[in-house]
Amino acid sequence: MEKKHNYVTPEEVKQGCRVLNPDDRDAQRICVINEEFRQGFEIIESQKSYKKSVTFFGSARFKEDHPYYEKARSLAKRIGTELGYAIASGGGGGIMEAANRGGFEAGVPSLGITIKLPHEQATNPYVTQEIPFYFFFSRKVIMTFSAEAYIFFPGGFGTMDEFFEIVTLIQTNKIVPVPVILFGSDFWGKIKECT
């Protein structure tokens, strides 16, 4: 699968934002948010192969030898091979890398919907299309846009934030209900007890 990097980085978006008053931080912020949404939707809409996808969420910390890594990789590969769906993730390491790797091995688009963070890893090498973001909330909108299912592996605060936002959006009918699959009953069972 050929890698595509025809995107504008968050830094380029910030530099390209022109507002009447350059000192108006709110106007600058609104410009960046608008550009992130525009670019994200434009990339997804321009690629017919992205219309159906499965989005994977989970820890960036799992290494290649961890059982969850292998399960995410093989599941993503199977989804890509048998259903032809694109695979999307946050584009980082761990579960995100495993999912993108499975999609890459299946020969389907492997999207990395990335965010630049201090002290975090680079985009994983299995991403064939990167869509970079500065703001978490605009990134989450794009991560949910064309998904036919959401698959959650154990993770930290970022994974939990994504999980709770998505199930709340489904519960309140703000997004179309699609399957939410929780992988790892020891981890997710505790949350299920609370609901």
PLM features per residue range, with description:
Residues G94-P154:
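Acidic/glycine-enriched connector segments
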Residues G103, I170-N173, T195:
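Active-site catalytic pocket residues across diverse enzymes, especially alpha/beta-hydrolases
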Residues E2-P10, C17-I113:
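Glycine-rich beta-alpha loop segments
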Residues Y134-D186:
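Active-site/ligand-binding-proximal alpha/beta "capping" segment
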Residues N100-R101, E162-E165, E193-T195:
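Short amphipathic alpha-helical segments
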Residues S59-F62, K116-P118, G155-T159:
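Short glycine-rich anion-binding loops that position phosphate/pyrophosphate groups of nucleotides
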Residues Y7-Q15, S53, P118-V127, F137-K140, ...:
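Amphipathic, Lys/Arg-enriched alpha-helical "gate/interface" segment within cytosolic domains
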Residues E97, D161, G189:
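Alpha-helical elements of the RecA-like P-loop NTPase motor core of helicases
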